[in-house]
């Protein structure tokens, strides 16, 4: 095949891709925390396990429930709702679970985070046009955006911030108690 023929073929395939305009679906989970519904890509999820009482951590804020052992690691477990709303934690039920999430930390200190769920998460495939921002400007620690997806209000968490908050709370660094201005 000549260089010109190869060039035309490449151009043609690029045009086809551009013309189709299809955006890829993102495989996500709708995650029912104790009071909120979260939307996260499945790639952030390591495993969902039955709820077990976390071992308390000294001087931890109320939203950091303690840590559980998972795959021979100590994983800090927190209540997302208590963190963002500044409230106490809610009661756990026999349906409660802990979702182990991959943290975004490059540190090996907290490679995973545990978040309390009221029930099992539900898979959902999402495209950009499926998500609508609600316009709720309420600022909360650990919240990237408040959205509506599949006729449900949900939160896209700020995983960087959550990792930072949990790491600091779990290992005694200076507490973070308010939003940056």
Give each language-model segment a name.
Residues 1-181:
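An acidic, low-aromatic, low-complexity terminal/linker signal
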């Amino acid at each position: 095949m000549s260089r010109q023929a190869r060039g035309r073929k490449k151009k043609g395939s690029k045009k086809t891709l551009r013309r189709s305009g299809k955006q890829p679906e993102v495989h996500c989970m709708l995650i029912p925390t104790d009071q909120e519904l979260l939307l996260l890509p499945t790639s952030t999820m390591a495993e969902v396990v039955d709820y077990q009482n976390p071992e308390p951590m000294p001087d931890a804020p109320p939203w950091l429930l303690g840590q559980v052992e998972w795959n021979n690691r100590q994983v800090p477990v927190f209540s997302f709702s208590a963190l963002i709303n500044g409230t106490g934690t809610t009661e756990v039920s026999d349906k409660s679970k802990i979702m182990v999430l991959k943290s975004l930390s490059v540190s090996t200190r907290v490679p995973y985070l545990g978040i309390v769920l009221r029930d099992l998460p539900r898979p959902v495939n999402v495209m950009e046009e499926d998500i609508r921002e609600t316009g709720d400007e309420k600022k909360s620690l650990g919240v990237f955006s408040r959205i509506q997806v599949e006729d449900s209000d949900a939160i896209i968490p700020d995983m960087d911030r959550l990792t930072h908050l949990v790491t600091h709370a779990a290992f005694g660094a200076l507490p973070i108690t308010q939003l940056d201005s």
